[in-house]
Every structure is written in C-alpha cells, then in structure tokens.
C-alpha cells in the first residue's frame, strides 16, 4: 500500500486538476451563451437566403449560373471541413472526423478523388497527418470570427467548382442542437439544390438589374459565404457546449477519485496507527 504522504500528494494533484476543469467549465458556460446569440442572429438571414436561392434555382432565366449546374459525372469531391482550434471538447472533433472518413471512403470506393479545405487547427492537423489533399486552410479565428477571414478558403472551392476541377462541394461541421447534443452535419453546397418548401413546384420569374449574370454572381457567392459563416457559428457553439459537458464530467470524476483516495488514505493512516499501538503494546509486554 502507498504511504500516507504519497496518497496526500495524489489527492493534492487531483484537486489542482479539478480547479482547472471547473474553471474551463465555467468559461465555456459563459461563452456558449454568447455563441448562441451570434448563431440566432445570423440564422434568419441564412434561412431567407437559402429560400431565395432555392427559388432562383428553378427560375425561368436565360442565364444559368455555374453553381446551379450539376456536372454529369462525379469524379472529384470537395469538402469544407470546420473544426475547433483547441481540444478538451470530448469527442466533438473525433466524431466529425470519423464520419468524414466514412464519407470519403465511400466516394473513393466509387472511383472519386477528394480535395478539402480546413477551417480550424484540429482539422488541419488531422487531415495533413493522414495525407488528404488540402487546397487551403485557415486557423485561429477565435470565438468571434469575421466573414472576411473565411472568404479566401471559400473562394478556393468556388473557383475549383466553376473551373470543373470539382464536381460537388460539401460543408462539414458540427450542428448545434442543444447543450447536450451536437450532430455532425454534411450539407451539399454545390451544385445548389432547389427549394424544398411547399412553393417549390412553381416557376419563378425575376427581373434582374443590371442583368442576371451580374446579380446572380454576387448573390450566389454571398449565399455560399453566409452558409459557411453560419456553420462556423454553429460549430463554435457546439465546441463550447461539448467542452462544458466534458469539463463537468472531468470535475465529477475528480470528485469521485478524491473520495476514493481519501478513503485509501484513511485506511492507510488507520493501519499505521494500529501498527504503532501494536508495537507499543508489544514493547511494554516485553519489559
């Protein structure tokens, strides 16, 4: 059995770790509220844009934007993968990467190749390690990212699709459902899909000023950017929620471990006292 001093040292070490996990839990709880507010503010805009683009996809126009054109053969797939920069978030990133690898292998089994861009340090490190072709990467955007910081990697994928170097583009991120549940999501970005609402079967006629090509070029690009930005906010909220839950679990486990070690310490101390008493009694008897 370990000595009382060793057990006391272990208890002190676990207590120090518990202080860290409790602090991280409190910080994440504070940050998640802000992340949820940012997410809620941007959602209506993204949803309205999605509905409008869905209608434009079915509109009667002589100009058909490249983002609306589905390629005949799917030989190369692009993914925009969003992860966190930091760890200590439970299985949030690993679950996303595991599902991503499953999707990639399905396409590769069908003869398609895969290119990705990564947003977040964890995704960049993971996919570089397994030798996936990375077209672009951006990291360390913080808890309040700006759209301008994402435009570069988004443009890489949009240009590749326009030039027919990619046949489909997907957005991969953690969708925030609630504090306890975050779901790995795969949304098709390109080609853009038609609206699925109850009016989707109508033909929509639009008047474009100055012309359809100019308007659609700006609208389509802005729409894709808004989707990626919204996904980024969803992922940030998911990260803080997962970290808060993980740190609470770590704190709870620390409490249990401290209780167990304290019990071991008490038994060791009791055994030592019993031993000393036995020695004293034995010595007195010998005298």
Curated annotation (Swiss-Prot):
Compartment(s) of residence: Cell inner membrane
What GO molecular function annotations does the UniProt record carry, in alphabetical order? ATP binding; proton-transporting ATP synthase activity, rotational mechanism
Q: Which GO terms describe its biological process?
A: proton motive force-driven plasma membrane ATP synthesis
Please indicate which superkingdom the organism of origin belongs to.
Answer: Bacteria
Its membrane topology is listed as: Peripheral membrane protein
- Keyword line: ATP synthesis, Cell inner membrane, Cell membrane, CF(1), Hydrogen ion transport, Ion transport, Membrane, Transport
Q: Which GO terms describe its cellular component?
A: plasma membrane; proton-transporting ATP synthase complex
Signal peptide boundaries = none
How it assembles, according to the record, is:
F-type ATPases have 2 components, CF(1) - the catalytic core - and CF(0) - the membrane proton channel. CF(1) has five subunits: alpha(3), beta(3), gamma(1), delta(1), epsilon(1). CF(0) has three main subunits: a, b and c.
User: Which family, according to UniProt?
Assistant: Belongs to the ATPase gamma chain family.
This molecule's function is given as: Produces ATP from ADP in the presence of a proton gradient across the membrane. The gamma chain is believed to be important in regulating ATPase activity and the flow of protons through the CF(0) complex.
Mind telling me what this protein is named? ATP synthase gamma chain
Primary gene name: atpG
């Amino acid at each position: 059995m370990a000595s009382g001093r060793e057990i006391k040292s272990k208890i002190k070490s676990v207590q120090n770790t518990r202080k860290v996990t409790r602090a991280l839990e409190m910080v994440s709880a504070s940050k998640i509220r802000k992340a949820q507010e940012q997410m809620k503010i941007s959602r209506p805009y993204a949803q309205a844009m999605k509905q409008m683009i869905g209608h434009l996809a079915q509109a009667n126009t002589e100009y058909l934007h490249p983002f609306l054109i589905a390629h005949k053969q799917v030989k190369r797939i692009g993914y925009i993968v969003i992860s966190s920069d930091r760890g200590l978030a439970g299985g949030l990133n690993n679950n996303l990467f595991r599902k991503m690898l499953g999707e990639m292998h399905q396409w590769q089994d069908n003869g398609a190749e895969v290119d990705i861009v990564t947003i977040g340090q964890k995704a960049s490190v993971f996919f570089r390690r397994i030798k996936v072709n990375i077209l672009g990467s951006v990291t360390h955007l913080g808890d309040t990212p700006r759209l301008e910081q994402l435009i570069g990697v988004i443009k890489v994928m949009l240009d590749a699709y326009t030039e027919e170097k990619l046949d489909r583009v997907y957005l991969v991120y953690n969708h925030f459902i609630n504090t306890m549940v975050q779901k790995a999501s795969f949304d098709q970005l390109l080609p853009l899909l038609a609206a699925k609402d109850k009016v989707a079967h109508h033909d929509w006629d639009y008047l474009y000023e100055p012309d359809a090509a100019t308007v659609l070029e700006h609208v389509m690009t802005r729409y894709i950017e808004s989707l990626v930005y919204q996904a980024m906010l969803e992922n940030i909220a998911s990260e803080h929620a997962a970290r808060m839950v993980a740190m609470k679990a770590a704190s709870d486990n620390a409490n249990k471990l401290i209780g167990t070690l304290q019990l071991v310490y008490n038994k060791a101390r009791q055994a030592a006292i019993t031993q000393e008493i036995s020695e004293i009694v034995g010595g007195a008897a010998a005298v």
